[in-house]
Amino acid sequence: EDIIAMVALYRPGPMQFIDSFIRRKHGQEEITYLHPGMKNSLENTYGILVYQEQFMQISKEWCGFTGGQADTLRKAVGKKKIDLMKKVKPEFVEGAVKVGGATREMAETFWTQLEEFANYCFNKSHAACYGLIAYWTAYLKAHYPDAFMAALMTSDHDDTDRLAIEMTECKHMGIDVLSPDVN
């Protein structure tokens, strides 16, 4: 779960919350929610909006959105469709006030956070896939460094800039890089 969260947080939208996420995880910062009605959706991520599914759940529970409306919101946010977001915003704010018991100011504040979050946010399944690849990659590099670096350099054989970086990494790891030898 931690790797998945870090993959999702390391994006331009939620990246600003990485330090807070870590402090909250380790009990060094209080976990807060803009509204108590968000606790169910944000509890697993220490009160921080990390995944698309979370704002979809909040829109259903806090704003009274249907599944279809929540999916429209996801499309608007995920694809940065500004016109669609402007169309959905009044429904979201009104729903938060009427259904969720939020103040208009609170609903507007969350909407602003949602707009910031829209910058390249991930759904959890994408983060999980990338996290799994990152885990495998780290495992292979740690346990089979020679083979890993050889495969990496082979895959980048036509990119001299990448090869230079990888050769420096080999040197740092204590791996000898030998020049081609036909004998």
Regions found by a protein language model. Name each.
Residues 1-183:
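Noncatalytic, beta-rich nucleic-acid-contacting surfaces in large DNA/RNA-processing enzymes
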